[in-house]
UniProtKB/Swiss-Prot annotation:
Entry's localization field: Spore core
Main location group: other
Residue ranges, annotated region (Disordered): 1-53
Record-given protein name: Small, acid-soluble spore protein K
One Gene Ontology term from the biological process aspect of the record: sporulation resulting in formation of a cellular spore
Domain of life of the native organism: Bacteria
UniProt cross-references to InterPro entries, sorted A to Z: SASP_SspK
Similarity section: Belongs to the SspK family.
Species for this entry: Geobacillus thermodenitrificans (strain NG80-2)
Keywords: Sporulation
Keyword Metal-binding attached: no
Pfam families cross-referenced by the UniProt entry: SspK
Basic and acidic residues bias: start-end ranges: 16-32, 39-53
Induction of its expression: Expressed only in the forespore compartment of sporulating cells.
Length: 53
């Protein structure tokens, strides 16, 4: 059975507040288009950050 048949809340009007979580320091590419180095360190740092919610 579909969610609409069970009065599932309308999720089309979701609003996200604040700045996006994506930070340039964790990006795989730099602003000039070159590839960022040390991907393991970058991904580990991104996973350990605590600036969400």
């Amino acid at each position: 059975m579909r969610n609409k048949e069970h009065n599932f809340p309308n999720q089309n009007n979701n609003k996200f507040e604040g700045e996006p979580r994506a930070k340039s320091e964790y990006a795989s590419k730099r602003a000039d288009g070159t590839t960022n180095t040390h991907p393991q360190e970058r991904m580990r740092a991104s996973g350990e950050r605590s600036d969400f919610f």
